[in-house]
Amino acid sequence: MSAGGEHLKDEGQRYQVVAAGAIAGMVSRFCVAPLDVVKIRLQLQIHSLSDPLSHKNIRGPVYKGTISTLKAIFREEGITGLWKGNIPAELLYIFYGAIQFTTYRTVTQSLHTLPPPYRLPQPAESFVSGATAGGIGTFTTYPFDLLRTRFAAQGNDKIYPSLLTAIRSIHAHEGSRGFFRGVSAAVAQIVPYMGLFFATYESVRVPISSLHLPFGSGDATAGVIASVIAKTGVFPLDLVRKRLQVQGPTRSRYIHQNIPEYNGVLSTMKMVLRDGGVRGLYRGLTVSLIKAAPASAVTMWTYERVLKILKEINQEAIQ
């Protein structure tokens, strides 16, 4: 393995990076799918948990934390309810993982070729590469993200019986723009998130690797630390994105039937602040961090292992 900042950007051929990134995303997604459904349900819940009077006229369930929400979904919708939206989410993670790692590798290699007066410090180089990879990956795969949210927000009332039905319905009633509701919040969120994630990951990986943790868990630990730091900073934009993704003609048919009508990132943020205060912007943060830590750990651990296997296979083929 390369040391320091050379680690992610120069190991493996392009097809190996694409394959490793895609497999890492797929494995990670399946492992954390139930927590993702819980997070989305909590983010779309607009009533205050501390004010029982706000529950009086609501239409839909009242979720009060990660464990109770998991139990409620399992009780009301069965085990499959915890994996709602998993098909578009798997497609999202596969394509996003492949695009993200490929773009990161390409950008960092390009930056590394700059002459000495223009070379960026290692943390800045990782930040720029991570932000670019995140922005491009988010925009190109955003329709899958929107579909994942809408399926996860469904209760027993099947708004979209299948993925193909959902695509046809959104295109027919909302047009092509319907697939990109909230995309500005997503890009605004993911650019600093991925920049912070990769910069932190590259910074802490070397010190952690010197601890010689078992089973290659140094990469996983670095991924956890990087994810928690980055996720907390940009979480309000993630909540705004989810609220915007369920706008449109089906807004009142999701599990939370009282979702307000939102228009634009700033106005949505103002409405959330007005109705729930600063805490309203961080609804679902706890489960998001619980999800983000294992998701990032599994992603980075799987990526490193798969890439290593592919390189070994390639070496054996050459010999």
Swiss-Prot record:
Keywords: Membrane, Mitochondrion, Mitochondrion inner membrane, Repeat, Transmembrane, Transmembrane helix, Transport. GO terms for biological process: transmembrane transport. Belongs to the mitochondrial carrier (TC 2.A.29) family. Gene3D superfamilies: Mitochondrial carrier domain (1.50.40.10). Solcar repeats lie at residues 12-110, 121-207, 214-309. Mitochondrial transporter that mediates uptake of thiamine pyrophosphate (ThPP) into mitochondria. It comes from Coccidioides immitis (strain RS) (Valley fever fungus). This is Mitochondrial thiamine pyrophosphate carrier 1. Disulfide bonds: none annotated. The keyword Nucleotide-binding does not apply. The keyword Ligase does not apply.
